[in-house]
Structures are given as structure tokens and as C-alpha cells.
């Protein structure tokens, strides 16, 4: 149909599914065509309008996308996607404060807040406002203690603020809930190393390796510490293991 320009009537959900299919395949020209045909048949369908604005944002046509989003907002003032897309437009135009404002507005009526917390935190990170980012990354971690990207970002914020004790406390809290968290052991090991607490650092990297014996970064960090204190043979062995595990056919 899309390749021959033959037009058939489809339900709006069919056009939405077809559009998502082509977007997932990164075939945006056919996705645009499907959305246009869908809107020709279902001009008032909000989901198709939002797919259209999403593609316009992808193509950097921000003004056109914003017009659509304003129109949808008039029809559906509490549409979650409208707020997320508007925030994306602001962010892409280096207007992080405006993005944060609109995301905070969305928090007042949206039940599923996780994505919004993360988006707000990332905008604060772009502004290098680490102190403001911290509570939102903490909310993400409280919701999902396996959200390691938020954990990395939270520790990054603490380190930039010189809040080392808070970093250790946060990682220790994660380890209380998940004692085999290789990421938490790895991160706390790096902190101990920076503090010159060599024995604690090595122990932490050992626990990271116990948690996952394929965890290359733990072997590398442990090797660096061992090299620093002159335990060269052990350092070389850990470097060797990290190289071996990094090879394509390693198991």
C-alpha cells in the first residue's frame, strides 16, 4: 500500500501499528507516509497527531511539532506525551530550565512518574546543577534499585559536590538490598581507591568479581590498584583476565 500509493481504509490503530513498525525499522519516510495517510482518514486521532509531532522532532522541525502539541493540549490538557515531547523540544534547543518546568507540571497529574523524574534529573545534570539533580535520581533508585544508570549519575553528582561520605552511604544502602550488586561494589571500590583505602578497594573489587566473574571493569580496576602498590604479578594476572574476557569468543 505505502510503496504503491494504493489507498485502503484502515482503522486508526492499524495506521499506528504500521507507523510504529517503520519507526522501529528506522524507515522514517514510510512512517511519515503511513501517518499522513492515517491522518487523512482519521484527522482527529490524537495518537496519530503525536506520532506526527514525534517524527517532526526527530527531523528537527520543532516549530511544526510544537504547533501540533499545542493543538493536542487544547483537546487533552493532561496528555502525558504532549508534556514529554515539549520537554524534548526545549532540551534539544538547550532550554533545560523550560524543560524542567514543563516536566514538573506533568508530575502534578501523571501517575507513572519514573521517566519524568529521570528526565528532570538529566536536565539538571546538563545545567551542572548537581544538587538539584540528586533528589530526582534518588527517586528513580527508590522506585527501582536495579536502575544502575541512575546510580552512576547519582554518584557522579555526589563526586562533583565532594560528597564522598554520601556516595559511600548510598552505595552501602544499595548493597544492603542487593549484596551481589556488582555495580555498587565496583563503584565503592573506586571511591576507596581514591581515598587511599587500598585493602577496602581490593576487597570491593573482589566482591564485584564474585558477583559476576565476567565483569571486566572489576578486573581492570583491581589490577590498577595492585600495580600501584607494587603487586605486579597479581596486577598482570588481572589485566590478563580482563583481556581474555574482552575477546569476542570468551565465555
Describe the residue ranges of each PLM region.
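Canonical positions in the second alpha-helix
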Residues: 38, 71-72, 105-106, 139-140, ...
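Start-of-helix register in tetratricopeptide repeats
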Residues: 13, 47, 81, 115, ...
Amino acid at each position: 500500500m505505502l510503496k504503491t500509493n494504493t489507498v485502503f481504509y484502515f482503522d486508526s490503530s492499524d495506521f499506528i501499528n504500521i507507523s510504529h513498525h517503520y519507526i522501529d525499522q528506522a524507515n522514517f519516510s514510510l512512517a511519515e507516509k503511513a501517518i499522513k495517510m492515517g491522518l487523512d482518514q482519521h484527522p482527529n486521532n490524537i495518537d496519530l497527531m503525536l506520532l506526527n509531532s514525534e517524527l517532526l522532532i526527530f527531523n528537527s522541525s520543532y516549530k511544526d511539532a510544537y504547533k501540533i502539541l499545542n493543538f493536542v493540549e487544547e483537546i487533552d490538557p493532561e496528555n502525558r506525551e504532549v508534556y514529554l515531547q515539549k520537554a524534548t523540544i526545549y532540551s534539544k534547543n538547550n532550554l533545560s530550565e523550560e524543560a524542567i518546568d514543563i516536566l514538573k507540571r506533568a508530575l502534578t497529574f501523571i501517575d507513572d512518574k519514573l521517566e519524568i523524574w529521570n528526565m528532570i534529573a538529566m536536565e539538571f545534570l546538563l545545567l551542572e546543577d548537581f544538587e538539584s539533580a540528586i533528589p530526582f535520581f534518588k527517586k528513580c533508585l527508590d522506585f527501582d534499585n536495579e536502575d544502575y544508570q541512575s546510580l552512576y549519575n547519582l554518584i557522579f553528582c555526589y563526586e562533583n559536590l565532594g560528597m564522598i561520605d554520601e556516595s559511600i552511604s548510598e552505595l552501602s544502602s544499595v548493597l544492603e538490598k542487593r549484596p551481589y550488586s556488582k555495580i555498587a561494589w565496583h563503584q565503592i571500590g573506586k571511591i576507596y581507591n581514591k581515598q587511599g583505602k587500598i585493602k577496602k578497594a581490593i576487597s570491593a573489587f573482589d566482591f564485584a568479581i564474585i558477583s559476576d566473574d565476567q565483569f571486566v571493569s572489576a578486573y581492570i580496576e583491581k589490577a590498577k590498584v595492585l600495580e600501584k602498590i607494587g603487586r605486579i604479578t597479581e596486577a598482570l594476572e588481572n589485566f590478563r583476565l580482563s583481556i581474555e574476557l574482552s575477546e569476542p569468543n570468551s565465555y
